[in-house]
Amino acid sequence: MKLRVQLEMVAACCLLAASSLAVGQGAAAKTASPADAVNAQLSLIEGEMMGAVKAMPAEKYSFAPSASVFVPSQKTVYPTGIRTFAQQATHVAQANYFFFSSVSGMKPDADVQAIAKLSNKDEIVAALAASFAFGHKAIATLTTANAFEVLKSNEPGLQTRATLSTFAVAHGFDHYGQMVEYLRMNGIVPPASAQ
């Protein structure tokens, strides 16, 4: 009986593999370039993050979580130096310029150091949007020929254009998750959750 069940499982796996191969052969004709693949992901985080920065009221841009927002019995210990909402957004903008200039070799089209000093909501929203636009231009330089060329990088594991560009997208999602919590702590439903 055990042998029969094992044979049925093997047969089922073979059928699944064969059907996957058949579907895969049809899809093989439709391949995306590295630029298209990464650009789609950058567009996703751009849409979500831009919605978040626009949703936060200007007077809440200085908000940062602290132990005071938690129930005292939780005994939450917060280190000093937690980024404000504004600092989260400016950090992502600066990081976009850093990562994507490394990916493409293009010089940033903004004063990256000055971004950290921004405190006005409209200026921060504009700087973040510009950093995403720069990212799209940089990603457009990715090709099948250069995506896995080794770059000079001090970051282990981020030595190719492909890994660095996908890390930039992941970095954005990390900070977007934190910004969503900031919105919720202020009673604001993130636009991506409201859809």
Tell where the protein language model's regions lie, with residue ranges.
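Solvent-exposed, charged/polar functional surfaces in cytosolic regulatory/catalytic domains
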Residues: 48-51, 55, 134-141, 178
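Surface-exposed helix-capping loop/turn segments at secondary-structure junctions
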Residues: 54-63, 139-148, 184-190
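Boundary at the C-terminal end of the N-terminal hydrophobic targeting segment
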Residues: 22-29
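Terminal, regulation- and interaction-focused segments at domain boundaries
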Residues: 29-37
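Short, contiguous alpha-helical
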Residues: 39, 43-50, 62-113, 152-195
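Acidic/histidine-rich alpha-helical segments that form the ligand environment
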Residues: 116-152, 161-175
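Bacterial N-terminal signal peptides
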Residues: 8-22
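N-terminal secretory signal peptides that target proteins for export/translocation
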Residues: 1-6
